[in-house]
UniProtKB/Swiss-Prot annotation:
Transmembrane residue ranges: none
Xref: InterPro entries: PEP-util_enz_mobile_dom (IPR008279), PEP-utilizing_PTS_enzyme (IPR050499), PEP_util_AS (IPR018274), PEP_util_C (IPR000121), PEP_util_CS (IPR023151), Phosphohistidine_dom_sf (IPR036637), PTS_EI (IPR024692), PTS_EI-like (IPR006318)
EC number assigned by the record: 2.7.3.9
Organism: Halalkalibacterium halodurans (strain ATCC BAA-125 / DSM 18197 / FERM 7344 / JCM 9153 / C-125) (Bacillus halodurans)
Residues binding phosphoenolpyruvate, per UniProt: R297, R333, N455, D456, R466
Protein family membership: Belongs to the PEP-utilizing enzyme family.
Known role: General (non sugar-specific) component of the phosphoenolpyruvate-dependent sugar phosphotransferase system (sugar PTS). This major carbohydrate active-transport system catalyzes the phosphorylation of incoming sugar substrates concomitantly with their translocation across the cell membrane. Enzyme I transfers the phosphoryl group from phosphoenolpyruvate (PEP) to the phosphoryl carrier protein (HPr).
GO biological process, one term: phosphoenolpyruvate-dependent sugar phosphotransferase system
Short name of one Pfam family: PEP-utilizers
Name of the protein in its database record: Phosphoenolpyruvate-protein phosphotransferase
Residue sites binding Mg(2+) per the record: E432, D456
Subunit structure as annotated in this protein's UniProt entry: Homodimer.
Length: 572
């Protein structure tokens, strides 16, 4: 039957292929009594080790193909497998109740899932999904059942699923998987972000694709408009084949812009930079003509290991990045651990609301030995290129002043040791807390630059967790309140002669770009694959014309009105 389903455009492009329905199998686990406890423990240990091997391989594959930030979720899954509460709980059931490993795994994981899902905090609820995903993998090894890997698909398909886990998305083979559509998800969900890195057309949040589509149905996924067509007519197939060809031609045109500067129609230069997680990610920045790195997430140096990285390890990583960028600006964010990123070896206490808790600069100012080691490595690397330092999650001037004072102390120590340090390192802050945006005029006097972290700024301003499906409709980048905060930050910085960048998903959003350009944003930092489309868009825009347009948008009532105004005026 013919259906037209609308959802959220997550990754641009057009896919036309037969549907592959990806549903999780339900496996009934029965409780059985055992007599040989040691054999059962050995079986569990083997399943845990095989699961770790798989996750390490997936993590490495994801890091190589999509960057360290996309691989972060698998480091979290590995931490679950090493969690003594979970592992010892399962072993305890086997030893004390003489039950089979499969049922012990089910009982303990179900208990943790129920506990996390009952909490009010959305971050803790997300941990339930991690435990469910990891437990499914371990169970598969215990009972010898394939856990539904999509890596084995060997014909052209469009995947239809309720949702795709990070493990699922990381294993997609672009040669055969032409696109996907899901019932749930938003533009900032894991699967959406990964689909953009892989350049696979995707539509998410449709609410009904699994209900309306049968295995083998012909499907069109329009990741440009957010439309899924089931069993299309010949005319629709022809029209979308033309649309797909036009999009591929457009990509070829974008490729010609790799060595070109990012200038507007009226000759204004805007810096298009990239977000990275490891030195390896610089490959993608250079291949896509990035003019700098607007966010180097240093926490990936600290993850998937059992001890803190040394000063020397960090120095080598930072040095490699600034050297390879050959004088182009590299903004390096100091450690942002906490919230959705944990380090097992720090043994931080569990928090009910870690996103608003002991994280980022708050952790660094308390655990100064960690902070000072990182700052020494950054200061040493500063002589090898255009390195800038950025402090995350700054809420007060006192935090900023303390961080700068510690950095100055470490600089003085290095100089006294005869170590060269650049005398022109710019220091800035992430603006991701609404109070910081409102007080930007105060901060602007004491920093060299701002970088607006919209992913957190939006969810904190709208009081809506971007990963929570039930309130995802409130995650509105174009909401007048968000635009006014951005405007406030830019004006405050410019009044002090300072520059402003943006390093959230919003920076690479084609609807947001005209607004941000009109508001005067100086630097747009995005995923490397978004740089060339953004550069192409800038060539068609006039910065001077956009100034009154952006101010007009600030006066509108709703995010929808803002979006429609931009689309009607600039995205016809």
């Amino acid at each position: 039957m013919h259906h037209k389903i609308t959802g959220i455009a997550a990754s641009s492009g057009v896919a036309i292929a037969k549907a592959f329905i990806h549903l999780e199998p339900n496996v009934d686990i029965e409780k059985t009594s055992i007599t040989d406890v040691s054999t059962e423990i050995e079986k569990l240990t083997a399943a845990l080790e095989k699961s770790k091997e798989e996750l390490r391989a997936i993590k490495d594959q994801t890091e190589a193909s999509m960057g360290a930030d996309k691989a972060e979720i698998f480091a979290a899954h590995l931490l679950v497998l090493d969690d003594p509460e979970l592992v010892d709980g399962i072993k305890g059931k086997i030893e004390n109740e003489q039950m089979n490993a499969e049922y012990a795994l089910k009982e303990v994981s179900d208990m943790f899932v129920s506990m996390f899902e009952s909490m009010d905090n959305e971050y803790m609820k997300e941990r339930a999904a991690d435990i469910r995903d990891v437990s499914k993998r371990v169970l598969g090894h215990l009972i010898g059942v394939e856990t539904g890997s999509l890596a084995t698909i060997a014909e052209e398909t469009v995947i239809i699923a309720e949702d795709l886990t990070p493990s699922d998305t990381a294993q997609l083979n672009k040669q055969f998987v032409k696109g996907f559509a899901t019932d749930i998800g938003g533009r900032t969900s894991h699967s959406a972000i990964m689909s953009r890195s892989l350049e696979i057309p995707a539509v998410v949040g449709t609410k009904e694709v699994t209900e309306k589509i049968q295995h083998g149905d012909m499907v069109i996924v329009d990741g440009i408009e957010g439309i899924v067509i089931v069993n299309p007519t010949e005319e629709e197939v022809k029209a979308y084949e033309e649309k797909r060809a036009a999009f591929e031609k457009q990509k070829q045109e974008w490729a010609k812009l790799v060595g070109e500067p990012s200038t507007t129609k009226d000759g204004a230069h805007v810096e298009l930079a990239a977000n990275i997680g490891t030195p390896k990610d610089v490959d993608g920045v250079l291949a896509n003509g990035g003019e700098g790195i607007g966010l180097y997430r240093t926490e990936f140096l600290y993850m998937d290991r059992d001890q803190l990285p040394t000063e020397e390890e960090q120095f080598e990583a930072y040095k490699e990045v600034v050297q390879r960028m050959d004088g182009k600006p590299v903004v390096i964010r100091t450690l942002d651990i906490g919230g959705d990123k944990e380090l097992s070896y720090l043994q931080l206490p569990k928090e009910l609301n870690p996103f608003l808790g002991f994280r980022a600069i708050r952790l660094c100012l308390e655990k100064q030995d960690i902070f000072r080691t990182q700052l020494r490595a950054l200061l040493r690397a500063s002589t090898y290129g255009n390195l800038k330092v950025m402090f995350p999650m700054i809420a007060t001037l006192e935090e900023l002043r303390q961080a700068k004072a510690i950095m100055q102390e470490e600089k003085d120590k290095l100089l006294s040791e005869g170590v060269d340090v650049s005398d022109s390192i710019e220091v800035g802050i992430m603006v991701e807390i609404p109070s910081t945006a409102v007080a930007a005029n105060l901060f602007a006097k004491e920093v060299d630059f701002f970088s607006i972290g919209t992913n957190d700024l939006i969810q904190y301003t709208m009081a809506a967790d971007r990963m929570n499906e039930r309130v995802s409709y409130l995650y509105q980048p174009y909401h007048p309140a968000i635009l006014r905060l951005v405007d406030m930050v830019i004006k405050a910085a410019h009044s002090e002669g300072k520059w402003v960048g943006m390093c959230g998903e919003m920076a690479g959003d084609e609807v947001a770009i005209p607004l941000l350009l009109g508001l005067g944003l100086d630097e747009f930092s995005m995923s490397a694959t978004s740089i060339l489309p953004a550069r192409s868009q800038l060539l068609k825009l006039s910065k001077e014309e956009l100034k009154p347009f952006a101010q007009k948008a600030l006066m509108l009532d709703t995010a929808e009105e803002v979006e429609q105004l931009v689309k009607k005026t600039y995205l016809k």
